[in-house]
Amino acid sequence: NRIIFVENSGSNAALLDLLSISACEQVCHGFPSKDVILKSGDIVNVDCSTILHGYFSDSSRMFCIGNVSEKNKKLVDVAKECVELGLKQVKPWGHLGDVAQAINDHAMANGYSVVRDVGGHGIGLEFHETPFVSYVIKKGTGMVMARKQC
């Protein structure tokens, strides 16, 4: 159903290039493979992007497959909470460090850490635009978000 929605939305998504699926311990940007069979207990991150009228979109979400351990469920829940807490910090004249610290603090408070080399990014006419959004910079630092960027 998702592929049909993308095709019918008027986008010109090249799904092999714009869909990444990372299973279990893989951090990000995995590729679908007929050799990787998901089973009950696995967790998976699905990252889907489309292009509409020349503009890119990018969305990522973690899912539980079947019955997962409490450890894996907690990871999925905390990852979602980190995203939500980070988004609450996106406001005019706020700093990217405000977003980063909200994410990093919540991850660490729950026994996790963020991957230093992976972060957010700008998006628009190009898939990966500036700024790179590090999740390890401090509140009050980094690029200032202008009113029409938020």
Regions found by a protein language model. Name each.
Residues N1-C150:
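Active-site neighborhoods and metal-handling regions in enzymes and metal-associated proteins
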